[in-house]
Curated annotation (Swiss-Prot):
<keyword id="KW-0436">Ligase</keyword>
<feature type="region of interest" description="Disordered">
    <location>
        <begin position="75"/>
        <end position="98"/>
    </location>
</feature>
<keyword id="KW-0648">Protein biosynthesis</keyword>
<keyword id="KW-0547">Nucleotide-binding</keyword>
<comment type="function">
    <text>Allows the formation of correctly charged Asn-tRNA(Asn) or Gln-tRNA(Gln) through the transamidation of misacylated Asp-tRNA(Asn) or Glu-tRNA(Gln) in organisms which lack either or both of asparaginyl-tRNA or glutaminyl-tRNA synthetases. The reaction takes place in the presence of glutamine and ATP through an activated phospho-Asp-tRNA(Asn) or phospho-Glu-tRNA(Gln).</text>
</comment>
<dbReference type="GO" id="GO:0006412">
    <property type="term" value="P:translation"/>
</dbReference>
<dbReference type="GO" id="GO:0070681">
    <property type="term" value="P:glutaminyl-tRNAGln biosynthesis via transamidation"/>
</dbReference>
<dbReference type="GO" id="GO:0050567">
    <property type="term" value="F:glutaminyl-tRNA synthase (glutamine-hydrolyzing) activity"/>
</dbReference>
<dbReference type="GO" id="GO:0006450">
    <property type="term" value="P:regulation of translational fidelity"/>
</dbReference>
<dbReference type="InterPro" id="IPR003837">
    <property type="entry name" value="GatC"/>
</dbReference>
<dbReference type="InterPro" id="IPR036113">
    <property type="entry name" value="Asp/Glu-ADT_sf_sub_c"/>
</dbReference>
<comment type="subunit">
    <text>Heterotrimer of A, B and C subunits.</text>
</comment>
<dbReference type="Pfam" id="PF02686">
    <property type="entry name" value="GatC"/>
</dbReference>
<keyword id="KW-0067">ATP-binding</keyword>
<dbReference type="GO" id="GO:0005524">
    <property type="term" value="F:ATP binding"/>
</dbReference>
<comment type="similarity">
    <text>Belongs to the GatC family.</text>
</comment>
<protein>
    <recommendedName>
        <fullName>Aspartyl/glutamyl-tRNA(Asn/Gln) amidotransferase subunit C</fullName>
        <ecNumber>6.3.5.-</ecNumber>
    </recommendedName>
</protein>
């Protein structure tokens, strides 16, 4: 597998709007080669008999089921409110809307 060239790193840097100096181009070229090599090794391991997954554990929606339970009446909920209007909490206006 041919390595990443300085020109390719410079092109990627331009696309990312990064300004890299000459020694940085060499440094990042080596790092990108290492990353591409690691991805290639993972690709070799990921065989046809290993299904692609988005999560390592087979968990789906581990939340409890909804159930109706007794709760406060509107009057009880509003009993401690400093201000209320039409069975709702009344709060100071924070936006400039009427």
């Amino acid at each position: 597998m041919p390595g990443i060239t300085r020109e390719e790193v410079a092109h990627l840097a331009r696309l990312a709007r990064l300004e890299l100096k000459g020694e940085e181009l060499d440094h990042f070229a080596g790092q990108l080669d290492d990353i591409i090599g690691a991805v290639a090794r993972v690709s070799e391991v990921a065989d046809q008999d290993v299904p692609p997954t988005s999560h390592p554990l087979p968990l789906t929606n581990v939340m409890r089921a909804d159930e109706v339970r007794p709760s406060l009446t509107p009057a009880q909920a509003l009993s401690g409110a400093p201000a209320q209007e039409q069975q709702r909490f009344k709060v100071p206006q924070i936006l400039g809307e009427d």
